[in-house]
From Swiss-Prot:
Species classification: Bacteria, Bacillati, Bacillota, Bacilli, Bacillales
Motif (Cholesterol binding): 515-516
Keywords linked to the UniProt accession: Cytolysis, Hemolysis, Host cell membrane, Host membrane, Lipid-binding, Membrane, Secreted, Signal, Toxin, Transmembrane, Transmembrane beta strand, Virulence
Modulation of this protein's activity: Activity of listeriolysin O is regulated on multiple levels. It should be high in the phagosome, thereby allowing escape of the bacteria from the phagosomal compartment. Then, once inside the host cytosol, the activity must be controlled to prevent lysis of the host plasma membrane and loss of the intracellular environment.
Native species: Listeria monocytogenes serotype 4b (strain CLIP80459)
Identification of the protein by name: Listeriolysin O
Residue interval(s) of motif Conserved undecapeptide: 483-493
GO terms classed as biological process: killing of cells of another organism
Self-association state and partner proteins as the record states: Homooligomeric pore complex of 35 to 50 subunits; when inserted in the host membrane.
Length: 529
């Protein structure tokens, strides 16, 4: 379904990216989905000559970092909630509906090669930054190493740039120098190539998850979701009670990626005066191995929260249709869900104003939000929205492994119903109508109460009508009627004996005819699914 959603969005919002690029090393196992540019990293600038002391320091740094003993698969791990007790099933009356809430234990395991960026930490995020691969990086608060830096080469993947115009060497790779270099690359493209490429379509990256717990969504979208949810305000309480269904969507429009050269040896990323002892004093060790930000995606990030109080099992399908723009005119239930749902959007980037936008609206307006920022130009500048890190030891991708257990809550509404009785036969009739009402004890076990109509086995003459109102938890409905024939050998004759009928909004039971030829009908108006 997710692939289908991506196709819908891509066809409607954007054209295919102009510049197709060669594939980089395989990161598909980490679901990067074109987030980070696949163009080959630029070559490192030539190393400047070192004095014997500087060479000694560089060799010691290389030996120390390359000798760090750690399992790259266990360095960056997020452990979310552990579920030990699953709340029992329960039911409750809500207006003209009976709601049954069920809970199941679920788990999520997600490998993320890219780390989301929100404004709170964007100042720490720049291509080539040296960071410690530890819990702070997992928590999206990278611990940047404050050391002198050597030169590095940046490249950008905007289309049309030739003759090395897409590359730039930063001689002293400080944060300000790197950011200035990125701005230089972007401005170079705007001045020399933008006219030839007036509509550079953003690359689309889309992911979604029905919401059940914060820990689950952090495992899905990364720890940046904590900050995002301060604005989204996912209603976990109402979701847990079965009163609300909400979905969170991460929608990225990536304008360009800036990549960093892979160092041929770890010491190439450090200034000549940096020593192994300095790195050790800064806490670089096997528990905190060094890594670097190898690629940064710039663009527009939209986080969406879709909300509805519907108990329908088709809510996810309705949300998917609203996002993709797929017509649901032929489906009344989906149409009603979309009509009675809302969204909240938190938007980073895509505006000349350096601010976070928060927008509330109806699902019918959602398409306008997603269409904005579909192309890159001066009026829709990109901001850092995600970055990838590599271990400095061997340039291997540093992948964050997220896992969490959570309680999936589902609810189903059973609408109250009614039995309409109409007796117009030429005879005395007696009815016997019964049903079961289902409730749940504190342990979630079913409690079945058998109910009978108060007018059962009472003689009724024509013309007799009545309505029996049944609650939404009524099941196994039985309708029986007999008529008095006046015959000594068959005083009572069965007219209708329908058993284990389902609850419907309106069930019409009619009996008519004569003592010897009684008739009946059992029809349904507006059946309840």
């Amino acid at each position: 379904m997710k692939k289908i959603m991506l196709v819908f969005i891509t066809l409607i919002l954007v054209s295919l990216p102009i510049a197709q690029q060669t594939e980089a090393k395989d990161a598909s196992a980490f679901h990067k989905e074109n987030l980070i540019s696949s163009m080959a990293p630029p070559a490192s600038p030539p190393a400047s000559p070192k004095t014997p002391i500087e060479k000694k320091h560089a060799d010691e740094i290389d030996k120390y970092i390359q000798g760090l003993d750690y399992n790259k698969n266990n360095v960056l791990v997020y452990h979310g909630d552990a579920v030990t007790n699953v709340p029992p099933r329960k039911g409750y009356k809500d207006g003209n509906e009976y709601i049954v809430v069920e809970k199941k234990k679920k788990s999520i395991n997600q490998n993320n090669a890219d780390i989301q960026v929100v404004n709170a930490i964007s100042s720490l995020t720049y291509p080539g930054a040296l960071v410690k691969a530890n819990s702070e990086l997992v928590e999206n608060q990278p611990d940047v190493l404050p050391v002198k830096r050597d030169s590095l080469t940046l490249s950008i993947d905007l289309p049309g740039m030739t003759n090395q115009d897409n590359k730039i060497v930063v001689k002293n790779a400080t944060k300000s120098n790197v950011n200035n270099a990125v701005n230089t690359l972007v401005e170079r493209w705007n001045e020399k190539y933008a006219q030839a490429y007036p509509n550079v379509s953003a690359k689309i990256d889309y992911d979604d998850e029905m919401a059940y717990s914060e820990s689950q969504l952090i495992a899905k979208f990364g720890t940046a979701f904590k900050a995002v949810n301060n604005s989204l305000n996912v209603n976990f309480g109402a979701i847990s009670e079965g009163k609300m269904q909400e979905e969170v969507i991460s929608f990225k429009q990536i304008y360009y990626n800036v990549n960093v050269n892979e160092p041929t040896r770890p010491s190439r990323f450090f200034g000549k005066a940096v020593t192994k002892e300095q790195l050790q004093a800064l806490g670089v060790n096997a528990e905190n191995p060094p890594a670097y930000i190898s690629s940064v995606a710039y663009g527009r990030q939209v986080y969406l929260k879709l909300s509805t109080n519907s108990h329908s099992t088709k809510v996810k399908a309705a949300f998917d249709a609203a996002v993709s723009g797929k017509s649901v005119s032929g489906d009344v239930e989906l149409t009603n869900i979309i009509k009675n749902s809302s969204f909240k959007a938190v938007i980073y980037g895509g505006s000349a104003k350096d601010e976070v936008q928060i927008i509330d609206g109806n699902l019918g307006d959602l398409r306008d939000i997603l269409k904005k920022g579909a192309t890159f130009n001066r009026e829709t500048p990109g901001v850092p929205i995600a970055y990838t890190t590599n271990f400095l030891k061997d340039n291997e991708l540093a992948v964050i492994k997220n896992n969490s257990e959570y309680i999936e809550t589902t609810s189903k509404a059973y609408t109250d119903g009614k039995i309409n009785i109409d007796h117009s036969g030429g005879y005395v009739a007696q009815f016997n109508i019964s049903w079961d009402e289902i409730n749940y004890d504190p342990e979630g076990n079913e409690i079945v109460q058998h109910k009978n109509w108060s007018e059962n086995n009472k003689s009724k003459l024509a013309h007799f009508t009545s309505s029996i109102y049944l609650p939404g938890n009524a099941r196994n409905i039985n309708v029986y009627a007999k008529e008095c024939t006046g015959l000594a050998w068959e005083w009572w004759r069965t007219v209708i004996d329908d058993r284990n009928l389902p609850l419907v909004k309106n069930r019409n039971i009619s009996i008519w005819g004569t003592t010897l030829y009684p008739k009946y009908s059992n029809s349904v108006d507006n059946p309840i699914e």
